[in-house]
Amino acid sequence: MKHFEANFDGLVGPTHNYAGLSFGNVASFSNASAVSDPKSAAKQGLKKAKALADMGMVQGMLAPQERPDLHTLRRIGFSGTDAEILNKAAKEAPALLRACCSASSMWTANAATVSPSADTQDGKLHFTPANLVDKLHRSIEPVTTGNILAATFNNSRHFSHHQHLPEHSSFGDEGAANHTRLCENYGNAGVELFVYGQEATNPNAPKPQKYPARQTLEASQAIARLHGLSEENTVYLSQNPDVIDQGVFHNDVIAVGNQNVLFYHQQAFLDTQNKFDEIQQKFGDSKVHFIEVPTAKVSIEDAVKSYLFNTQIITLPSGEMAIIAPTNCQENPAVFAYLNELVTLGTPIKQVNYFDVKQSMQNGGGPACLRLRVAMNDMELAAVNQNTLMNDALFTRLNAWVDKHYRDRLSVDDLADPQLIIESRTALDELTQIMKLGSVYQFQK
């Protein structure tokens, strides 16, 4: 049986805009009110996904959320026709309207935490949608995320889907952006690393002072319990609160792992050496390559600006590892110099490939944000909804779908345009037919 890691990228939705909703995310905040280009954003994401499929990787797509989210606006007291609701919200509560129009579900690293069957007690692949309670615009995603995941991984013999954690800050959960898995081979039991920013039940534990810690230890422990993980293959690491206060809002902005490699910044974690000793002990006899990037070579500021660590490390069919990096890494002299050096250091990482995902980057999400990793075997892949898997036909069809339905210019003021609801719902209704998802959206029920 073959084992591999698949990547499921989020399709950028028709309302992709720059509303600056994410406090603690420097790129999101600094580009607030810029005019976005949803068509280009979607095409950039598709191009990256297709390039990985062309490299021989298993690549899938996850559908976006329904936006504008009129159901949430109704729930908080706006009434009337769809157009009237948009108009009232734009006048009376523009910040709430912006939150209900976000295309942030494109960053599927926050969609869920995934544990492969090799790690779980019942031998199934487990999915728990992230509750994303720290940010209003993302906290309205989990139910639809669960619907989309269940329609994509739609076989109960192989896949187990859990409800998101209770919607309270004690269980703040940001999904796979704070989780990585190390393993010798994808089919072997691995070591799952859960990175948290604070302990909700321990007021004396370290926590950031300026920006919120979005992931709690309690949430990470709950996910491990739900997924049936053993203590022997689970490690909890505290993120350095100082780097959270410098704009490192998720662990995938400061570290990334793949198989036997953990690529991280010198300042990423607390109690680093003890935790790495625990990882190595639980990993077993084979060596884990801990690749540390020193502050002297790349500052936290440069790491956040370029998204050096929000890259994907993938294992190519040849067995070599490659980094999938945003072009912003090429444009930052310190980061570009480091990546050129990295491939000469004798680590498993042998090449770097650069992709333009600037529409996503300007809203605070690099290549790693755009994908949910699912380690699986060929039997499990055969059980996935095949209409969600990237190939020449799907790439052509989705590009044509984007051309047909997406605007090439969207300002924050445009979010109050009633036509946007019609355009978005028409697009998503057609998408559910292309990807054979069934009725995953509220407007379809």
Curated annotation (Swiss-Prot):
It is an enzyme of class 3 (hydrolase). Its EC number is 3.5.3.23. It catalyses: N(2)-succinyl-L-arginine + 2 H2O + 2 H(+) = N(2)-succinyl-L-ornithine + 2 NH4(+) + CO2. Pathway: Amino-acid degradation; L-arginine degradation via AST pathway; L-glutamate and succinate from L-arginine: step 2/5. The active site is at E174, H250, C369. Pfam families: AstB. Belongs to the succinylarginine dihydrolase family. Homodimer. This is N-succinylarginine dihydrolase. It comes from Shewanella woodyi (strain ATCC 51908 / MS32).
